């Protein structure tokens, strides 16, 4: 099968070439209090 990965390439991969990135939370879920406030404001 030609679609199998080249294990030699994986074994010789240098992790030092990877760049270190800082991950940031982008879409945080709202708290229960925030959801309740929004529900109350929609009703009134």
From Swiss-Prot:
Signal peptide: none
Record keyword Metal-binding present: no
Comp. bias intervals (Basic and acidic residues): 1-25, 33-44
Listed PROSITE patterns: THYMOSIN_B4
Keywords of this entry: Acetylation, Actin-binding, Cytoplasm, Cytoskeleton, Phosphoprotein
Residues spanning the membrane: none
InterPro entries per record: Beta-thymosin (IPR001152), Beta-thymosin_sf (IPR038386)
Modification N6-acetyllysine occurs at: 4, 15, 39
Gene Ontology molecular functions: actin monomer binding
Pfam families: Thymosin
GO annotation, cellular component aspect: cytoplasm; cytoskeleton
Keyword Lipid metabolism tagged: no
Modified residues (Phosphoserine): 12, 41
Region (Disordered): 1-44
Annotated positions of the Phosphothreonine modification: 21, 23, 34
GO term, biological process aspect, one: actin filament organization
Post-translational modification N-acetylalanine, affected residues: 2
Compartment annotation: Cytoplasm, Cytoskeleton
Family named by the database record: Belongs to the thymosin beta family.
Function recorded in the entry: Plays an important role in the organization of the cytoskeleton. Binds to and sequesters actin monomers (G actin) and therefore inhibits actin polymerization.
Listed name of the protein: Thymosin beta-10
Lineage of producing organism: Eukaryota, Metazoa, Chordata, Craniata, Vertebrata
Encoding gene (name): Tmsb10
